[in-house]
Amino acid sequence: MRHTIIAAAAVAALAVAGQAGAHARLIVGSPKAGSTVAAPPQLKLQYSESIVPAASSVKVTGPGGAMVATGPLMLDAKNKRIVLIPITAKAAPGAYKVAWHMKTEDGHETDGGFAFTVK
């Protein structure tokens, strides 16, 4: 019985430690990864942690790898986990890639990306 309690406590401690050291991950994006959409006016990215916009960036490339003009990265007024990126030029039909680098309020930095298609 004593060994079971000690083992359970060790497992619980490891689980909590793993969560404390976790980096932000993208929960959902709009447009969604792999989706086909009409030209979006903005990207909306929701993360698992609060984001520091001044230390974060998003790059969007379109057909042929051309950079897509975007406005400044902003946080949603009600949720610091949601990042908004205006797309300032009309997106032409084709494949798009989004690459992001986010810094969270706890100081961790993480990178990721996804693709979508404009019809």
Task: Give the positions of each predicted feature.
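Bacterial N-terminal signal peptides that target proteins for export
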Residues: M1-A7
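Bacterial N-terminal signal peptides
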Residues: A8-A15
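N-terminal signal peptide c-region/cleavage motif recognized by signal peptidases
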Residues: A17-Q19
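N-terminal edge beta-strand
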Residues: G21-A39
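Extended, polar beta-sheet/loop recognition surfaces of beta-rich domains
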Residues: L43-L45, H108-K119
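Short, surface-exposed alpha-helix to beta-strand junction/turn motifs within ectodomains of secreted
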Residues: K44-L45, E49-G71
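Aromatic sugar-binding surface patches on proteins
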Residues: K78-L84
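Short, exposed beta-strand-loop hairpins at the edges of beta-sheets
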Residues: T88, A92, A99-G113
